[in-house]
Amino acid sequence: MAYAQDGSLLIDEKKIAPRQSTGEGEEEHPMNQIIVPMGKHIKLQLSDGSQLDINSGTKVVYPQKFKKEYREIFVEGEIFIDVTHKESNIPFIVKTSLFTVNVLGTAFNVKAYKEDTKAEVVLVRGKVEVKDKKEQNYTLMPNELIALNEGTYTDKKKVNALDYISWIDGILTLNNQALSIVLEQLHR
């Protein structure tokens, strides 16, 4: 499933016509919502060409077609996103209930499940800026992780980013994790 630049939906490379606007009171950029059931994960291409891998138990809200001024999506759960460089002059923003990530051309993982007080962002390549609930900004470089608790910065450290995105290939890498975390990951 993917979106073309004009906002039309592509399923198996076949174009599905976008919904026609009545012009009265409708949003200029209608929002879509995708909810991935437990035990599943899906891939999604946004209208700008950015690729999302969406993990189980995750909700993503995104526009059918991005605004000209900025690109913004909302996440509750875990995604890996590879932001396209075609429109690098247009900011790409990922919002969660706990923090905001301003993308500076990159690929990264966001983990912010609604039921968890702890959240994290791991950078694979490029550069991102994470803004916590206290409006503090933290810049990440490749193979760095920022941890937040209830939306507030708690830690920044060097990691092997590939360990944090192995879920995309159906592999859980849980080195030195507490049993409670292992069980939580297996549940999802």
Located regions from the model:
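A residue-level detector for the "anchor" residue at the start of short, highly conserved motifs
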Residues: 1-188
